[in-house]
From Swiss-Prot:
InterPro entries: Ald_DH/histidinol_DH, Ald_DH_C, Ald_DH_N, Aldehyde_DH_dom, G-glutamylP_reductase_CS, Glu-5-SA_DH, GPR_dom. Signal peptide: none annotated. This is Gamma-glutamyl phosphate reductase. The gene is proA. GO terms for cellular component: cytoplasm.
Length: 420
């Protein structure tokens, strides 16, 4: 096993091969990575079978689905890499140019961060997405996968590095930390001088640990306590469709809905219809029904467990939905502000004034009017695959694509000027 220190030194030694690579060279490397990923399908699936067998009974079925790979999912991962090829190269982009009275020409241009560390949980697709985005944005990457997905991740990284071996970019620009202990995560948090940026992708425990302990700059990809508010002027059919999609299409992802707020004027008519869609119809179709966690008012209209206070602060990542009846739009917004992780929140309403109030007052990275929160995604936003959803305001916010993985510098051109 290569030590963490050796890996940090290796990636530092070769980072210039990617930091200054041309767009053509990077695109050739990405295509080679995608081809070798597909070529290694058999090996990756064998590794994934080991991870799945080890994880069964230890994590929920929803989380097992995150971990699971088949040939179609591997092909989708390769397709995601190829889509990054089609994106414009951000490196070298001129952001601003100005000329001072003394003749100095100042150009602000986009540059690579350098080396980016990614700590993430059991999601194999993050491995290929992170490698593709960091490479296209001119960065080397150090990956630290969750233990549950390590065999799969190792097989994926092996394939990606074999692809790089056929190009002029050194394979060591992609590093996988072999130690999956907690100590390896803390070592990355303290790797100042080796990592220029650290991005955690996972649950609240992981993200909080990184934010609280890292001395390396961090972009926080926050958890998603995602709200949908059904206003008194909502179209109920739209609301049913939006909630069904936001909650059930992929409950294990961070843009999935976790909390429903319903105006009291809508509760009696809307909540029984919602129960029919999310519970009865799903049972009839052989699908897992949604389990409601209901406040006292909501429990008057539908069946479910009584909500506890923590239910409105929980990212369930499962077929569970907390439901609260509110007396006004203002109460809904106040609830969101008290419990939000500032990820994605939505209002369903036909009232333009209510929509404007909601979008102005809710302080989240993505705020929706009459649409599912599942659209908070780099691919859906036209950014290609993403590094995560930033819930902070400094440097990056919302889906992080290529530009969010870069910095800038000033190039000052003169003709012998000196400062008087």
């Amino acid at each position: 096993m290569v030590s963490r220190q050796e890996q940090f030194e290796q990636v530092q030694a070769v980072k210039k091969s990617i930091n200054t690579a041309s767009e053509e060279v990077k695109n050739q490397a990405l295509l080679a990575m995608a081809d070798h990923l597909v070529a290694a399908t058999e090996e990756i699936l064998a590794a994934n079978a080991l991870d799945m067998a080890a994880a069964k009974g230890k994590i929920s079925d929803v989380m097992l689905d995150r971990l699971y790979l088949d040939a179609d999912r591997i092909e989708a991962m390769a397709r995601g890499i190829r889509e990054v090829v089609a994106l414009p190269d951000p490196i070298g982009e001129v952001l601003e140019t100005s000329q001072l009275e003394n003749g100095l020409v100042i150009t602000k241009k986009r540059v690579a961060m350098g080396v980016i560390g990614i700590i993430y949980e059991s999601r194999p697709n993050v491995t290929s997405d992170a490698a593709a985005l960091t490479l296209k944005s001119g960065n080397a990457v150090v990956l630290r996968s969750g233990k549950d997905a390590y065999q799969t991740t190792h097989a994926i990284v092996t394939a990606l590095k074999k692809g790089l071996e056929t190009t002029t970019i050194h394979p060591n620009v992609i590093q996988l930390v072999e130690d999956t202990s907690r100590e390896s995560s803390y070592a990355m948090m303290k790797a100042k001088g080796y990592l220029d940026l650290l991005i955690p992708r996972g649950g609240a425990g992981l993200i909080n640990a990184v934010v609280e302990n890292a001395i390396v700059p961090v972009i926080e990809t926050g958890t998603g306590i995602v709200h949908v508010y059904v206003d008194k002027d909502a179209d109920e059919d739209k609301a049913l469709s939006i909630i069904n999609n936001a909650k059930t299409s992929r409950p294990s992802v961070c843009n999935a809905m976790e909390v429903l707020l319903v105006h009291e004027n809508k509760a009696a008519s809307f909540l029984p219809r919602l129960e029919q869609v999310l519970v009865a119809e799903r049972k009839e179709a052989g699908l897992e029904p949604i389990q409601f966690r209901l406040d006292s008012k909501a429990s008057q209209f539908v069946s479910g467990q009584a909500a506890q206070a923590q239910d409105f602060d929980t990212e369930f990542l499962d077929y569970i939905l907390a439901v609260k009846v509110v007396s006004s739009l203002e109460e809904a917004v106040a609830h969101i502000e008290s419990h939000s992780t500032h990820h994605s929140d939505a209002i369903v309403t036909e009232n333009a004034e209510a929509a404007a109030y909601f979008t102005d007052q809710v302080d989240s990275a993505a705020v929706y009017v009459n649409a599912s929160t599942r659209f908070t995604d780099g691919g859906q936003f036209g950014l290609g695959c993403e590094m995560g959803i930033s819930t902070q305001k400094l440097h990056a916010r919302g889906p992080m694509g290529l530009k969010e993985l870069t910095s800038y510098k000033y190039v000052v051109a003169g003709d012998g000027q000196i400062r008087e």
